[in-house]
């Protein structure tokens, strides 16, 4: 019985450590944007915005995507008080991690964009956006963020062929989320959930085109447009976590240190229990 108990503790430790890493990585900051126009506190817009953010948190425990229109009915005192917004989690996230990511987004967007009539926030695992104008379902391929790795590849025919195969596969999707791999080159892409299949394909084609034009021979790159994104990396050449341009290194370092200390403490307890069971 004691051995079964020890095995259960070990399983719980390694499972929770893996889950924690997955959850923490989804919270990594990618980009944020705030409208220059500001609203006055304690106004109908602020009330509608707070209602939207509360609805987002509630909905994210059940769905990976949802959109909202708050205060846009005829009884609204002013059309400028309406809030249109959406959230979306990366399609491979568990529902619990999606909910945590969205909660983090809500907490951060109010700090990054206080009193803004419009704001957007992209984390590694989720996206949050609201505006006072109705943008829902309307195609928008404006560039929001790009990152090209500092390392590049020259005269490697196999790499570029596999990269282009992956990117062609990504831009052809009409499913909203796609993962692709060719040899050591991997990538994934996603559209917001309210885009039609044809608009999603068009958005991803634009994103892939910008990846090639803006990042050239980079061994890894990511391009985020207003309603879709695409990214790729050569796993044999590149590790995103080692790139000095990758964000949130302080947070990662702290998480690693805390994880190591916690793991060491649990192992000490387990060894002590094993020693006691032998006597």
Swiss-Prot record:
InterPro entries given in the database record: Cell2Cell_Antifungal (IPR051378), GNK2 (IPR002902), GNK2_sf (IPR038408)
Record's signal peptide: 1-20
One Pfam family, short name: Stress-antifung
Cytoplasmic side: 275-279
A GO CC annotation given for this chain: plasma membrane
Domain Gnk2-homologous residue range list: 27-135, 137-237
Function comment: Modulates cell-to-cell trafficking.
Protein name: Plasmodesmata-located protein 8
Species for this entry: Arabidopsis thaliana
């Amino acid at each position: 019985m004691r051995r079964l108990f020890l095995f259960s503790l070990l399983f719980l430790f390694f499972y929770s450590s893996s889950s924690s890493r997955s959850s923490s990585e989804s919270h990594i900051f990618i980009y944020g944007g705030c409208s220059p126009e500001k609203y006055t506190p304690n106004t109908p817009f602020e009330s509608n915005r707070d209602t939207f953010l509360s609805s987002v948190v509630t909905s994210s425990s059940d769905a990976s995507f949802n959109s909202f229109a708050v205060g846009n009915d005829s009884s609204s005192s002013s059309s400028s008080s309406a809030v249109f917004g959406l959230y979306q989690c990366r399609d491979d996230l568990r529902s619990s991690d999606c909910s945590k990511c969205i909660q983090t987004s809500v907490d951060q967007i109010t700090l990054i964009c206080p009193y803004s009539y419009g704001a957007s926030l992209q984390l590694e695992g989720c996206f949050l956006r609201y505006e006072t104008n109705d943008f829902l379902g309307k195609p928008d391929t404006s560039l929001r963020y790009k990152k090209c790795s500092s390392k590049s590849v020259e005269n490697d025919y196999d790499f570029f062929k596999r990269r282009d195969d992956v990117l062609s596969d990504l831009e052809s999707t009409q499913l909203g989320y796609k993962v692709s791999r060719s040899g050591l080159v991997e990538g994934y892409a996603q559209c917001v959930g309210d885009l039609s299949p044809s608009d999603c394909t068009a958005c991803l084609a634009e994103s892939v085109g910008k990846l090639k034009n803006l990042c050239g021979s980079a061994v890894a790159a990511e391009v985020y447009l207003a309603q879709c994104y695409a990214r790729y990396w050569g796993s044999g050449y590149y590790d995103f976590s080692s790139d000095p341009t990758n964000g949130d290194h302080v947070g990662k370092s702290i998480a690693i240190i805390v994880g190591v200390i916690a793991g060491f403490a649990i192992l000490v307890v387990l060894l002590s229990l094993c020693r006691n069971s032998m006597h």
